[in-house]
């Protein structure tokens, strides 16, 4: 069995908090309307289309046509997306720093829209610690599709079984295990740190 010497992270809900409500709770004071908006108008499922590579302006225009009374809030999704990401997950960025200080090669595979990534990436110097990051919206491949893991192995130059992939989504974890990676289903930074210590990647 190969030794695990590389670590591959997901970004949202592993390194950074993410929820559409973080933005829209600032704009929509009525809780019932807020829940309607994030379950029927700007929803995680609709947002996922941008993760998969669909153009943001096309998505927004289509949604505004369908829900014209919400045009301003739909526009805010496009212009204020970084506010859906309030900050890092407790303890996760410290793990990245500790791995980097031990010269463990670091990578990421993230379901993230290309245009939103261009806005978010420069705000977070932690990503300078990573050798490469695969962004779904750029590649037009998304987790848990096997093709995105195949691309990662090829582009990162990794042999199957030599990297552990960390994701909060169970389906993504299962697919990673079926496509060349060891995998950790992320719940919190403490349990992740324990696993990385067990793998001798951290002390």
Feature map (PLM): residue ranges:
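Asp-based, Mg2+/Mn2+-dependent phosphohydrolase catalytic module
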Residues: 1-9, 113-114, 118-203
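Proline-centered loop/turn at the N-terminus of a beta-strand
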Residues: 105-107, 182
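Generic structural signal for small/hydrophobic residues in well-ordered secondary structure
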Residues: 10-13, 53, 99, 108, ...
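Residue-level marker of regulatory loop/turn positions in helix-turn-helix DNA-binding domains and
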Residues: 88, 109, 141
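N-terminal helical cap/lid subdomain that shapes the substrate entry/recognition surface
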Residues: 2-94, 101-102, 113-116
